[in-house]
Amino acid sequence: MIGFNALGHLGRLGNQMFQFAALKGIARNRGYQYCIPPSQMQGEWKDHHQYYNAVGTGAAQHQLLQPFKLQNTNQLNLQFIDADRPVVQEGSFTFNEDLFNNCPDWVTIQGFFQTEKYFKHIRDEIKGDFEFKDEISSPCKDMMAEIDEPVSLHIRRTDYISNPNHSALGLEYYEKALRTFDKRSTIVVFSDDPDWCNEQELFASDRFLVAEENSAYVDMC
């Protein structure tokens, strides 16, 4: 069995999805069982301290159990790898073929694993794992059914504005992207800063709908 004890301490929901999928893909390729920690997280990610304050306490703070059915995951898959077991690092932001093909058993892997090469052989199963729970997907489907040929526009601002490792894209980027779509399309704007979006002239016309839920789960769904 291999695990990912640091799940939830290395990024938000998107990162956690890559990490889970890679863990499962590596385990399947090697013929192992896999496990992720049970999570104590309540609500959605709002502050990085929710993650990092739990490091070293034996508490997990990942989000995967909240929005997704994880229908191929059972109780055996919800546990920590023993703390005295080796930690195997990804090593870089590129595909680690050696780790994929030669990962030892009874270790916890660690990294970002941001490539589908780790899990493309179990693509359909991963898609099933990441099916949203009905309480999230049902209202989203109802809303989108009322919009003819919608286009989703996602704008991340809050943490990117102050993070020196990232940058918030300017309005000219979105304006250029929108030119590739039919001007009659309805644009649904999802953002962690909906108030800012509502203030922008670019999104003022009737073809734009700014989602007010401010929920990462609803926005992704």
Name the predicted role of every residue range.
Residues 1-44:
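N-terminal pre-catalytic "stem/leader" segment of glycosyltransferase-like enzymes
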Residues 1-7, 135-140, 205-206:
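Short amphipathic alpha-helical segments and their helix-coil junctions
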Residues 8-16, 163-170, 216:
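Aromatic-acidic/polar surface patches that form glycan- and anion
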Residues 13, 181-221:
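Donor-binding and catalytic core of enzymes assembling or modifying cell-surface/extracellular glycoconjugates
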Residues 28-33, 71, 75, 176-185, ...:
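Structural alpha-beta junctions
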Residues 36-38, 154-155, 186-191:
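Short beta-strand segments
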Residues 41-46, 161, 193-199:
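Short, charged/polar "capping" segments at the starts of alpha-helices
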Residues 44-183:
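Secretory-pathway luminal glycosyltransferase catalytic domains
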